[in-house]
Amino acid sequence: MTATQKHNLFTPEPHYIPGYAGFYPQLRYQVGNTYGRTTAQLLTDPSVQKSPCSVLSPMTKPKFIEDFSKSKPPWIPCRDLREPYIPHYTSLKPYKNFEILGQLPRQDVDTQGPPQVENRQGPLTAGFMPYPPYPACPPGRKGEARDLGHPGLLLAYGEEAWKDAAPLQDTPGKNNQLYHCRRDEYLPPHPPQETLDVGRFQRLPQLDHPNLIQRKAISGYAGFVPRFAWVMGMNYRDGVTQAMDDFDKNQFVFRHPVCALGERLPRTHWPNTTIYRSQGLIPFYMGFIPSMQDNYALTFGNSTRRAYQKELDRRSHTL
């Protein structure tokens, strides 16, 4: 079956909807057609250059290029989402899991011998001490740390903790010496952690044109701003704010003219007098009508006529 053809009275596609206040090229030189037909001719004319980011909806049906036939790997949440700290925070985390910074892991101490001092700094000068002159810890057992709770309590209690501890039981093949952590001993660098991948939060479907969905909306306000002029070097937001402030000041002076005492107010004191008519206003007028809210049991036309009479009485008693 052939598709139904639209009548020539209808506006051809594509065209801009009336009321669009954006920019379109060469419209000022087209005469004799309606707004829709003129924009349709411009959009279909190959000689007119067009922006790749059009505000019109796509003419053709978008194609989904995402392949759903292949099985996807299980989604693994990013580590930054499981941590309570700020994402990408790599500084110090005090008392994290009650670990002492600079202490070798437990499995490394069990399997290896005394940690070799690895100096990663440059050559030391004469008289330089790589670590504070703390006395070396006396020998003890590994189980003493569990007896006293936190491993750092051994150093806090001092000699009494070592004297009260049970005697050593040497085990062949293992070295139970506790070593003091020096500042010139460094742990191996941690493997790089997984960073936050912003792309995994993208929920938009993959189309043949990336910005196809965003093209349906007109970005930015392109309407009329009173007393607004393009000034070189001024931001749009600042220009609109300055224009609206200037407009408010102008309206205040226009509605409150300066006149001497005893003089009659000029006609500009009532700039919106066109809404007051003896015939009354037509229905569905959505503007503001002063003193109309005090009228009851009247139609819209009679209420506006009553407001017109009240306005005449008010002006007659005004200088």
Curated annotation (Swiss-Prot):
Q: Is Transferase found in the keyword set? A: no
Does Nucleotide-binding count among this protein's keywords?
no
Name where it's found: Cytoplasm, Cytoskeleton, Flagellum axoneme
Q: Which InterPro entries match?
A: CIMIP2A, CMI2A-C-like_dom
Any Pfam family matching the protein = CMI2B-like
Query: Which terms does the UniProt entry file under GO BP?
Result: flagellated sperm motility
Keyword annotations for this protein, in alphabetical order, are: Cell projection, Cilium, Cytoplasm, Cytoskeleton, Flagellum
| GO cellular component assignments | axonemal A tubule inner sheath; ciliary basal body; sperm flagellum
User: Member of which family?
Assistant: Belongs to the CIMIP2 family.
This protein's assembly is summarised as:
Microtubule inner protein component of sperm flagellar doublet microtubules.
The record's function comment reads: Microtubule inner protein (MIP) part of the dynein-decorated doublet microtubules (DMTs) in flagellum axoneme. Binds to the intra-tubulin interfaces.
What's the name of the protein?
Answer: Ciliary microtubule inner protein 2A
Lineage of origin: Eukaryota, Metazoa, Chordata, Craniata, Vertebrata
